[in-house]
Amino acid sequence: DFDSLFKAMSKISKNELVDVCVGFDPYLQNIRMQRESLSSDLKNLAGVIKGNKNRVSAMKDTVKIALSGRRYMDNVEYSVHLILEEKTQESATTSIVEVKRICNHAGGSEIESSIPKILRANPFTPLNNIIGPRGERWMPIHVIIPHSKANQAMREIQQLLAKHQDKLDKNKIGVGFLYTVISNNGFVIEPVFFTPDSIDEIHKEVVEDGILKNIECFEDNPVARGLTNTLRYELFDLFEDIGGVHMQIGKSYNFRKGLNIESWNVIENIKHTVDPNGLI
């Protein structure tokens, strides 16, 4: 469950044991497994080989990933995927042992490390993830909170969504979660909406043709879109109530509401100084 996942991720983060720490809930995990094609898998495997200077080790990794395919995730619910870097093999081994101990203590069990190896070998992949596997509109939001508040925040998010579950089901809107950490002091929860709605020109421009030709072309769906937007803004309010912050000033989030009056006055004074005529 997410309590066990968060426990492990926070412990690993607070001890600064890894460079990348990413978790998925069951829904988003399933989406991730659906999304990629065989040709994409082969490209990723090629990246694993190219990204490893030790050809023997690279071939071993590639064979393990190919043999495990996607079956290794079949019975997995919540998962965490980790990448760590150290100056020596000895220190790396020590960190790996400690990471495994923390995960085992939280009730986890080890799976094939395909996702970290592929992420490491292919850091700049095409932006095909900006639509769902069937062509759904992808709408993520996020909140950053202290580690100590992560579990309670997740429970409150789930409670809010549960109140609207009938409407979500009726409109075939899926909600998944991505989790990550920021150094040893921040925990990121990212709810991701997959809405059966039309996509924009930017999606058609950015997503690869091989992906676009295999998706459904959803018609404009203002009801589903409206429900998604309503829930997003309800979640924004919840994030502010629990003391969360975000990384996207000027976008959907209410920057002003998250500041006390003194901080807002500082911002206004700076704005007046650099833009006295209000041109920006």
Please report, for each region that a protein language model flagged, where it lies by residue.
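Conserved glycine-rich FAD pyrophosphate-binding loop
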Residues: 68, 72-75, 98-280
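C-terminal substrate-binding/cap subdomain adjacent to the FAD-binding core in PCMH-type
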Residues: 1-123
